[in-house]
């Protein structure tokens, strides 16, 4: 289990699936800057949901921009507009999350 509590078997599965950022599509390590390096992402911002449907890899730039925003809110941000990131352009794992994401998370 890594420091994000992702089991090793799931980490390997996700690394094989997500060879590029699930949001912007940049291939990891294709650019020399830190922003293109992979980072772990909870698509729905709930660290308790450790499933193949919620854990993904995205570039550090997208992860930093998304932060704790709801996915639907973030997709409408200036960052996403500038980079051409939309509900139609993201990876399939994100598209599936969008289909099931509640409009608001109640505590």
Predicted regions and their residues:
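Short, charged surface segments at domain edges that flank catalytic/cofactor-binding sites
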Residues: 1-25, 49, 81-104
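Secretory pathway export signals and precursors
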Residues: 17-20, 54-58
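Histidine-centered nuclease catalytic patch
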Residues: 25-57, 66-73
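Short Cys/His-based metal-binding microdomains
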Residues: 62
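Short, surface-exposed, polar/charged, turn-prone segments marking secondary-structure boundaries
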Residues: 65-71, 84-89
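Phosphate-coordinating loops and pocket residues in cytosolic domains that bind phosphorylated ligands
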Residues: 76
């Amino acid at each position: 289990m890594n420091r994000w509590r992702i089991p090793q078997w799931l980490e390997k599965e996700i690394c094989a699936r997500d060879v590029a950022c699930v949001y912007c599509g940049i291939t990891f390590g294709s650019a020399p800057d830190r922003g293109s390096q992979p980072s772990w992402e909870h698509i729905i911002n709930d660290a308790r949901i450790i499933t193949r449907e919620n854990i993904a890899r995205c570039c550090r730039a997208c992860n930093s921009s998304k932060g704790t925003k709801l996915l639907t809110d973030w997709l409408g941000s200036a960052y996403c507009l500038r980079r051409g990131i939309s509900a139609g352009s993201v990876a399939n794992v994100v598209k599936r999350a969008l289909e099931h994401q509640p409009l608001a998370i109640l505590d």
